[in-house]
């Protein structure tokens, strides 16, 4: 494929940091598939690196010096997105000048970024982030405040450079009990959504069925719904307040086209 040809010449992080190449792979699905929007090619950990965290991709992301105490949180820098990660915005500028369809930007939500930073990568049981969250509330709050500020600035700059939509991904938000999600995660998400200006906003948390009654307090434009709940049920519990997105198990994309169409049509009918 066209993407694989580019990847053979460069590593993933370098691709994210090279505006001409990142713009090219962003445009590829629009040209090849005719999709009605483009999704910025990047990675959710790009702004984390700008805080002073060492990241490698092997091929999954690895944090080389995980955050485990309040002193390490204190040592993290502050982010000035357009200075520290200017390559992201140069990519957006190129795309806005070339695309005839809307551009979707994105970021990782504070808790999901914290999971990577504290665990050192992906995890099966997330014991380190939970130990930090329950055992050092001051350190956890400081980390989440810093990440919330970082993500808000990062996304607002994406909007300012021309993204029509921005999405906040909380991939690991679903690891917590509902009451813990409400206390340790949701306030930071709400703050970001309340303060983003100038674009449509989308929030996705994996395991959303446990949190719908809290999430309906958000001010965002749309909610991403995973495949763990019927989309009609999610809409009902969200009081029909949001545009809903998703709901298809990604594994279905490995099936034949007729099977994919069947399941996608089922979601639209629901």
Predicted regions and their residues:
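A gly/proline- and charged-residue-enriched helix-loop-helix capping module
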Residues: 60-98
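Short glycine/proline- and acidic residue-enriched helix-loop micro-motifs
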Residues: 8-11, 71-80, 133-140
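N-terminal basic, low-complexity leaders that serve as flexible interaction/assembly modules and, when applicable
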Residues: 1-59, 186, 191, 261, ...
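Intrinsic-disorder/low-complexity, polar/charged segments
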Residues: 18, 69-75, 125, 256
């Amino acid at each position: 494929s066209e993407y694989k040809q580019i990847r053979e010449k460069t590593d993933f992080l370098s691709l994210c940091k090279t505006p001409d190449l990142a713009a090219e792979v962003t445009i590829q699905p629009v040209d090849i598939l005719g999709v009605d929007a483009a999704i910025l090619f990047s990675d959710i950990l790009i702004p984390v690196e700008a805080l002073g965290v060492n990241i490698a991709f092997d091929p999954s992301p690895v944090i080389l010096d995980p955050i485990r105490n309040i002193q390490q949180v204190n040592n993290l820098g502050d982010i000035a997105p357009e200075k520290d990660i200017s390559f992201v915005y140069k990519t957006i500028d190129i795309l806005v000048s070339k695309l005839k369809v809307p551009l979707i930007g994105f970021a990782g939500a504070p808790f999901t970024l914290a999971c990577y930073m504290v665990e050192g990568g992906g995890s099966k049981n997330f014991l380190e982030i939970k130990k930090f969250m329950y055992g050092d509330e001051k350190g956890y709050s400081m980390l989440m405040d810093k990440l919330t500020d970082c993500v808000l600035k990062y996304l607002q700059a994406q909007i300012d450079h021309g993204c029509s939509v921005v999405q906040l991904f909380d991939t690991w938000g679903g690891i917590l009990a509902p009451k813990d999600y409400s206390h340790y995660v949701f306030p930071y998400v709400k703050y970001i959504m309340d303060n983003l200006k100038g674009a449509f906003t989308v929030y996705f948390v994996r395991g959303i069925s446990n949190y719908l009654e809290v999430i309906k307090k958000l001010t965002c434009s749309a909610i991403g719904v995973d495949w763990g709940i019927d989309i009609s049920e999610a809409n009902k519990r969200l009081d029909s307040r949001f545009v809903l997105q998703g709901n298809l198990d990604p594994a279905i994309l490995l099936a034949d086209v007729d099977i994919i169409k069947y399941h996608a049509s089922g979601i639209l009918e629901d």
